[in-house]
Amino acid sequence: MLETITSVNGVVNGIVWGPVGLALLFGTGFVMSVRTGFFQFGHFRYWLRNTIGAIFTDRDITAHTEKNDKAISQFQSLCTALAATIGTGNIVGVATAILSGGPGAIFWMWAMAILGMMTNYSENVLGIFYRRKNADGEWSGGAMYYLADGLGSKKGCKKLGRVLAVLFACFCVLASFGIGNMSQINSIAGNMNAAFQVPNLLTGILLAVLSALVILGGLKRVAAVTEKVVPLMALFYILGALTVVLTHVTAIPAAFAAIFKGAFAMQAAGGGVLGYGVSRAITWGFKRGAFSNEAGLGSSVMVHSSSNVKEPVQQGMWGIFEVFADTIVVCTLTALVILTSGFVDLNTGRMLTEVQGSALVGEAFSTVFGSFGPKFIAVSILLFAYSTVLGWSHYGTKAFEYLFGTKASMGYKVVFVAMVLVGATMKLDLAWDLSDTFNGLMMLPNLIGVLSLSGTVAAITRNYLDRKFHGKRVEPMWSAFAAYQKEEEAEEAPLDKAANE
């Protein structure tokens, strides 16, 4: 039975994460970049200033909502999305990309991220535009909703939209138990045992208790934790990585040269483990880039849709920054840590060690921090992976809610917490492979939705730019539903009146 599952999974995985799936992912990013006038470049300073640049100057970005308001702040939505996005892929995934695709894989990871910014932007724009309130008064949005209500509203596509929405939700629930839970917890337990000799069972019990305290409290409690944990864990890792890279500052030019050389030139087999050339660099760069920032999977839009923002484009800009922070900043630092620490021949791209995964990154950190290097990585993985569990708990909850209703979501949360203990104490090779596939299966219906609604994204973007840049007095495009549009306009009217007085 297990052999059959493994065999079928291998075939499906080869399709969704093979040339066809990766081309669809890259192509969607390119199409959305074109349709929005390459917004990520043309308005670089604007989106940077209105996201991370506004955290300390605009209270609306970070202000907590009222107790009876089920929405969360823009900053909380970003932190919860980054909590799920910045995970083991930023450490283990980058190491695997270099080992399997050579230094050139990092270039293609950047390429995927640059276009993925607009895929993530588009998901968030659609998420806000098609979101609706559930029975508890909480915003619910995501690929399920823009597939059912967006694609489904097109002529002859009603059934297709609904079927794809249900499939996406099913794949998301299954993926949440794998890549969003057990696989992450398994990484934590293994690294804590190797670095500090903490028994896996003890790690599982502690993490299950901590997860229950946060997850069972709902989105606002998850957001309250992630807005504190994510900035600290990111700062912790970035400072550590910068210390290593700057210690090896003389190797930085050669590291970048190896990245560009490997991206476009055939190189010899790496370390006797896996041969690679341009095609392998592209494949592994695209694949690990997608795993790292999740742009195209339709996952983080579920928490972005819970933001108290009115403008779809504003939340879309947070989606751009999310990919930028995850891949361009964190993954690049991990890559430079490995490439500047002497474990890769920068002239040929060959690996000079047989150490793999998180152990390779730990060894790279140990060139500066000594025996504390592996411990630093163990703590980083603990923070990254645990925060991923918190973020994915919300994704799975929203997908489960879409399938079975709001009242059923607590049952999902209880099972999700129980799986934390399972993840810490079991071997999960098949779980890793299956969750990898379910992630890819989430991607396919989501990208169909994004591409089919690319005109809507372009129209919303033009509407925003006309109002904000060109001074045109046009009706804002805030919601696809008249009732929510009027509700948002009613809330905005007193603010406009005060501004004009």
Residue ranges and their predicted role:
Residues 32-33, 112-137, 148-186, 190-214, ...:
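Helix-loop-helix module between adjacent transmembrane segments
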Residues 59-98, 129, 135-151, 173, ...:
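Alpha-helical membrane segments and immediately flanking helix-loop junctions
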Residues 24-48, 164, 168, 185-192, ...:
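Membrane-interface loop-to-helix entry segments
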Residues 62, 67-71, 102-111, 149, ...:
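Membrane-interface alpha-helices at helix entry/exit sites of multi-pass transporters
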Residues 123-135, 242-258, 266, 270-273, ...:
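Extracellular/periplasmic helix-exit of transmembrane alpha-helices
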Residues 38-72, 96-98, 102-106, 110, ...:
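Flexible loop linkers connecting adjacent transmembrane helices
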Residues 4-5, 35-40, 89-94, 176-189, ...:
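Transmembrane helix-loop junctions in multi-pass membrane proteins
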Residues 1-84, 88, 98-105, 116, ...:
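N-terminal alpha-helical transmembrane segments of multi-pass membrane transport
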